[in-house]
């Protein structure tokens, strides 16, 4: 049976659960939080009506979901060779031949094209930023840097930080220092998050010959790098001074709490996996709490 002529190599069509794995729905959903926060902050700071802005928000969320999901599907297509080596990737439909390459590419490019149309309907800046995110993630991260340099995580952080900027421009139609500040928060957050994950999967990345920082430079060098990015996060709440001193204080406490955890939870060499897990879990909570603060504090200020 020709793989290019059927939806899957095994019996039955791709399930919704498998579709979510193909487009990395968990990653997409996580990025929709800062995307919405960007739109919400633009509405509040520019005194727009929330009700009249709902169509823009919905179109932005749909467009963002489609371009991110499409780019992730294309990443899965390109990474099939290394995913087959890594134990944590064995459930992916692209690894166990649940979807053909032809249909995977149709799904990927179809989602990205429709998503870009949605963003360009909103305005040109949103569409352009979305396109830059696609090109950055697929070309500069997936195809080039992921397999060739330990700077891959930092390079991938550029396209990974565009969701709140798209959210902002969907409402305002132009960039601002506030949008750039949101970008910088996500940009600095990503290396800490993904280095922690890379420590946990160090052996897998080494086996697949992917030059993640822990696999090439070791744990101590990676830990130092994570603290550098934690320090860079510290001043960023002050760039969002429009949200007031309460937000700055609470966001700074979030940052200091992360630094404290990093300093106190590592006792001995054998603890590095436990330490990485704690840092990874904190990173997930940090993302939600930070942007929840953005929304809640701005709502309180508006009242």
Swiss-Prot record:
GO cellular component terms, semicolon-separated: plasma membrane
Q: List the disulfide bonds.
A: none
Signal sequence: where? none
Q: Which UniProt keywords apply?
A: Cell membrane, Heme biosynthesis, Membrane, Transferase, Transmembrane, Transmembrane helix
Keyword presence, Ion transport: no
Q: Quote the EC number.
A: 2.5.1.141
Pathway note: Porphyrin-containing compound metabolism; heme O biosynthesis; heme O from protoheme: step 1/1
Where would you say this protein principally sits, based on its record?
A: membrane
Q: Which EC class, in a word?
A: transferase
Reactions performed catalytically:
heme b + (2E,6E)-farnesyl diphosphate + H2O = Fe(II)-heme o + diphosphate
* Additional remarks: Carbon 2 of the heme B porphyrin ring is defined according to the Fischer nomenclature.
Query: Which NCBIfam families does this one have?
Result: cyoE_ctaB
* Record text on subunit structure and interactions: Interacts with CtaA.
Q: What is this protein called?
A: Protoheme IX farnesyltransferase
As recorded in Swiss-Prot or TrEMBL, the protein's gene is named ctaB
